[in-house]
């Protein structure tokens, strides 16, 4: 009956003690048992029907249960002073959460001050990072990076940002602030400083690497603009800016996030980052300082978007060591390890495991040699110089006694590893017993170059190790981005450093972490954003773009030259040679016509005849 009429009222005749038990349970009255005693209740069959029962004791069809108001009132506890006190503290804690989590309450909303932020590179792309922070009277630049050309930019080696807007405001600029020493953040510094100079503020390693670039470009005298800083100290730059560098973990040592303090409020720029809880040098990210600013109140956060799609926390650099140990332990011949030359902790671990297995270390590649030399010079890493050998000494040692650390992990045509793979390196030729370890990921666009180099290496008989666990990223995953957002707790959020889909994904993470959708803007290069305690808005667009550089002579290549080269590459060339008399300017012979990229060689004569 109950299953068939679940949720609907039924009539139950009250005839036996069994039914009495059910009725007493339904009315929540205590059941005393069936034994006869002085306290026994009268038989329910003799009860006077209540308003919900008919004369036969059946429940009326409306299904209302017998009233229990009397019992409910009897068991309801009246509020006491302590209850009211607890309720008051619940309200107070809710208000405390509101104050803690809503940055709106931490800012000076009466302030009329504002700051303008203008990215000139690094958005809609990976690389070329440069950003202008500007008040009414002064401005600073954060990073001055380069990027790499695509395959259509014939004869172009690097791209640098268009400095047109910097030329417009150069009299306002009071300094250049550097977050870290990767090429996409410092690579364009020599080209800027050949034209205009400002004080440069940064930690020692980035300044040292900028110094080597100045030396290569024959502008060594501009080292005088260096201002090394101490982390966790406020550095006054001009009158309108106070900047603090906070240690951050990344794929290059001595990286920083920065807090830019202005009259309008504090802007946190993360730089490139990941949250590595077990870094090789033990220097974890300064989360305490980020939290300090978050508690104090942050006007705007600008955060790295590169790994926005990665939902798994980024692996620790220290985790690569055991993987290298496993690979090195099985090697019977030479080991050739290639990685990014700037990843000094990766190189450090490779050298340590090479030493463990009794190998001498040969570092090949100009950028690799330079970076290791700088790191050792300033005691970022320490090795006995006796473990190193030159490239021309490699052949003097047994193969099992040699570790070669080299550039070329991206298959670059002029890199050391690529030249080894095609047999063109002067000192090192690939052998069938060699183990090649690629400890890097493919930068988007380089997959074809890497694949071609791998083909060359394997045709030479070498074994190639390209395992996933011998590389970890240097950029924050979604979970680390969430941690940054929660620690800093900004009122406004500007996702940066990545292609449009990366910053769009990061925007969603920001909304997930409590930043109102209206307080997030997706910038593009050249868009100027004005930020004040009460608002954030786009105000104008400035000229931006790319300048093409030929590394052979460090000269700029004009845009129309690149367009001509692209046209020549797609359409081909016709060359006509005509011999003309000096006396009367008449042709002395039939013209000779040669074509390139138009018809096949065997058809060239027929084409010329036509």
Enumerate the predicted regions with their spans.
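Intrinsically disordered, low-complexity RNA-associated tracts
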Residues: 1-97
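His/Asp/Glu-rich metal-coordinating catalytic cores
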Residues: 78-175, 182-397, 415-429, 448-451
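Hard-cation-handling environments
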Residues: 309-439, 443-490, 494-610
